[in-house]
Amino acid sequence: MEPASLEKDSQPPGQANTEKANPGQGQANAGSASPDEAATSHHRHGSPKVGSLEHPERIENVPGHVIPILRQEFDDFDTESTRFLRGELDGEEFTKFRLKQGVYGQRQPDVQMVRVKLPLGGVNPDQLDAFAAGIEEYVPLRKGHITTRQNVQMHHVPLPDAAKLIRELGDAGLSSREGCGNTMRNVTGDPRAGTLEGELFDITPYAGAYVRYFVRHPTTQSMPRKFKTAFAAIYDEDNAITRIHDLAFLPLVRGGVRGVEVRVGGGTSIMPRIAPTLYEFVELDNGEYLKVAEAIVRIFDRTDWLRANRARARIKVLIDKIGIDAFRDLVEEELTGDWVVERDFSLDPVRFDHDEEANAPAKPDSYATANGDLREFDEFLASNVRRQRQAGFCTVEVVVQRGDLIPDQFRGLAQIMRDYTGGYARTTVHQNLVLRWVRDEAVYEVWRRLSELGLGDAGAQEVTDVVSCPGTDSCKLGITSSMGLNQAIQERLVEMQIEDELTRRIHIKMSGCPNGCGQHHIANIGFYGASIKVGEHTIPAYIPHLGGAYEGGEVRYGERVKARLPAKRVPEAIERWIRFYESERSDGEEFNAFVARVGTPEFESRVKDLAMPIEFNLENMNYFVDWSKNVPFEVIRGEGECAV
């Protein structure tokens, strides 16, 4: 659906020239895959609905089935993991193989993390049931974790069980293919795409085509480093935070033609960059965006000097070195290559076409109304519910604390989806779940059902909805227990009983190391894990950032605060900063504007005593133990496998 009145012909940000506006003009746009690529790229020249020996992938345009399942991969994983456990296969060779199937080593020996990719966060009720069953059977901690890239991860899985788990999840159409390693990672997007007021069109079919085009693509199997892509649903809103990604697509319409602005070279970690504009407008329906994307990844894949230092092997490093204009020249040259005429960029074989509206729930004959709990429901309604552009429907955002769900919650959510959404939901980059196509009349019943599962909290994407990565709970690169700190901060914020509307808009995020998986760079108040040496002992600590932003189409990285706070003092620091903001701000002044006006030194001065040295003794022993842990803290960092 594309409302004519919403057509956007205005010039987007970036340099304007005809070369940028029309990449690869005159280049061939169709063809067939070369024979040596047929086994892995048949989806670029055909779309069989049922598997066969020649075309084993099955493409189904049903919710949650974006990535075609290839069952031979499960057989291969069984075989190779058995060989490895018998000592018949080299460890490094097996690790590379394992990562492509989304099975990742943890800081704990002999167990794995299984990462299931959910393109644009899409998941259906049967798949939530499959997660519940798999977690009960194979995951010792009995929980699954929604990540900041809309995946679901399961931790502490023994290798033989990981082989069984990915196969059983595959039976439900869930894929971990290329969930790890130097591959095309999960493609993320706005969880409300297709339902938003102000949308030019639904980006979902085009994002789905992108996923299908590049999964198992020969060029993306062993790149210098991982490659992350995101699709926005609305250019000026960008709830997918596309600008921090390696490759970003933002929707536009020009002259009635659907297209995207293409940005490339974003990223966080120790070298944060906002992706600059490569092309202001690239067409979608003719497959031009797939052609441009392949040119980009081909250049990235063969830039071998990036492989010399894996800490600086992302595409942002290349663009930082040569500049976006020089990179555009490389793309234009790449688009003249012979490979272009050997490809079929038609979207017909790979588009993810599914009419959600046709399957949306009917209006109920009767429905419950608030009874003695109106205040709590009104809070939920104000913060978690958003009206869809389709009359009579809304989306409901479920707050999932720390992104963790237990089997009963997976199953309960599945049943709510069946009863009230037509079966539609998507995870978010904030570790929540958005229920789509909920009838306006059914929202109260949905809230009551969510509350029975412990998932009825109000405050979605507000100050109490704290985001963090797994940290030292499982990650080899983790320095601190970011999940433990998340819980401590969330509990402190709830105790503060914050009712101020401007304060509730503050976003707090943390990562267990500088890499940024917890999005600390773009939070209003962000932290990353560090440490403080006290003689032979070590205190878990955090480095704060202030003033980050990602809403309203703007991305800004926060400013580092010159303080190293012991982990156990971080909740106190947050409370002081919030009270400082509430007492000293101007009328209607947002938190980031306040930070910019008063400066970070003012914030530093208010926690100076919290950053003072701590003597190691029995009275202070608590500071030397991390949140949610019961042993003295020490920095134990392994070698991350994401760049193996």
Predicted regions and their residues:
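Peripheral terminal and linker regions in Fe-S/redox and tRNA-modifying enzymes
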Residues: 2-644
